[in-house]
UniProtKB/Swiss-Prot annotation:
Belongs to the tetrahydrofolate dehydrogenase/cyclohydrolase family. The keyword NADP applies. This is Bifunctional protein FolD. Catalyzes the oxidation of 5,10-methylenetetrahydrofolate to 5,10-methenyltetrahydrofolate and then the hydrolysis of 5,10-methenyltetrahydrofolate to 10-formyltetrahydrofolate. Keywords: Amino-acid biosynthesis, Histidine biosynthesis, Hydrolase, Methionine biosynthesis, Multifunctional enzyme, NADP, One-carbon metabolism, Oxidoreductase, Purine biosynthesis. Pathway: One-carbon metabolism; tetrahydrofolate interconversion. CDD domains: NAD_bind_m-THF_DH_Cyclohyd. It comes from the Archaea. The lineage of its organism: Archaea, Methanobacteriati, Methanobacteriota, Stenosarchaea group, Methanomicrobia. SUPFAM superfamilies: Aminoacid dehydrogenase-like, N-terminal domain, NAD(P)-binding Rossmann-fold domains. InterPro entries: Aminoacid_DH-like_N_sf (IPR046346), NAD(P)-bd_dom_sf (IPR036291), THF_DH/CycHdrlase (IPR000672), THF_DH/CycHdrlase_cat_dom (IPR020630), THF_DH/CycHdrlase_CS (IPR020867), THF_DH/CycHdrlase_NAD-bd_dom (IPR020631). GO terms for molecular function: methenyltetrahydrofolate cyclohydrolase activity; methylenetetrahydrofolate dehydrogenase (NADP+) activity. It catalyses: (6R)-5,10-methylene-5,6,7,8-tetrahydrofolate + NADP(+) = (6R)-5,10-methenyltetrahydrofolate + NADPH; (6R)-5,10-methenyltetrahydrofolate + H2O = (6R)-10-formyltetrahydrofolate + H(+).
Length: 280
């Protein structure tokens, strides 16, 4: 079975638009990007197009590539203080001279729609998340949509970043899965994968996972974004793995669209929370 993230994201975006229109709220998202990295610029454009589609207002702030940490923090502070802005997203990676951790921690937790602030990550680990990072949360939505219940299953997460690996593991634990996190120091990755019912790969190695490394009843979620011979591909060798497993996400058209749909959901959630606080 092919898990169609594009289809599910379209469905979610339509639902979000309806909910926003019925709410009477006008959520607003601010994106901050430093430099002219083509991939980052493309991702930001996609996010703003999604905002327009679901009736979320958005502004884009582009800073020079040689911006200092202080300059980025100044921008964040201004957005934190702006009551018209409900969500703040800093497009990563930031230029080498900018302290990414300091920038993330400067965003107000209630406007941290990316879910990277230590406060929000802590709540996620505690089992009561306010905002979870968009890619892992989007994956959980995909699993739910396809009636794949992680409870009691063995899940292997490859990667330990704060944007995918670590929060993905936490969400799966919260869903009662038995979770193993693998990474560059894991001694026998294939052995771990063969035992897994659910595999989430965010390792960044093109077509690394092959059919002989997975079991026949596995669900494989490919978060990898790699370019080979000018074409986009994931961490999974789709040709060999898709013939064997129970379900798999393609690249493109799998996880990527869900990340953006989840960002819209988080932004609307932020607007609702801030509206309630204003009213009361």
């Amino acid at each position: 079975m092919i898990i169609d993230g594009k289809r599910v994201s379209e469905k979610r975006l339509e639902l979000i638009k309806e909910e926003i229109d019925e709410s009477g709220l006008y959520p607003r998202l601010a994106t901050v990007i430093a430099g002219d990295n083509p991939a980052s610029l493309l991702y930001v454009q996609m996010k703003h197009r999604a905002c327009e589609r679901v009736h979320i207002g958005s502004i884009s702030i582009t800073l020079p590539g040689d911006s200092t940490t202080a300059k980025v923090l100044e921008t964040i502070d201004r957005l934190n203080k702006d009551p018209e802005i409900n969500g703040i997203l800093v497009q990563l990676p930031l230029p080498a001279g900018v302290d990414t951790e300091q920038v993330i921690e400067a965003i107000l937790p209630e406007k941290d729609v990316d879910g990277f602030h230590p406060f929000n990550l802590g709540k996620l680990l505690g089992g009561s998340p306010t905002f979870a990072p968009c890619t892992p949360l989007g994956i959980m939505t995909l699993l739910k949509e396809y009636k794949i219940d992680p409870a009691g299953k063995r899940a292997v997460v490859i990667g330990r970043s704060i944007d995918v690996g670590r929060p993905m593991a936490a969400l799966l634990i919260n869903a009662n899965a038995t979770v193993t996190v693998c990474h560059s120091r894991t001694k026998d990755l294939a052995a771990e994968l063969r035992k897994a019912d659910i595999i989430v790969s965010a390792m960044g190695k093109a077509r690394f996972i092959t059919g002989d490394m997975v079991s026949g009843d596995a669900v494989v979620i490919d978060v990898g974004i790699n370019h080979v011979d000018g074409k986009l591909c994931g961490d999974v060798d789709f040709a060999s793995v898709s013939e064997k497993v129970a379900a798999i996400t393609p690249v493109p058209g799998g996880v990527g669209p869900m990340t953006i749909a989840t960002l819209m959901e988080n932004t609307f959630k932020a607007a609702k929370m801030q509206s309630c606080r204003t009213v009361h």
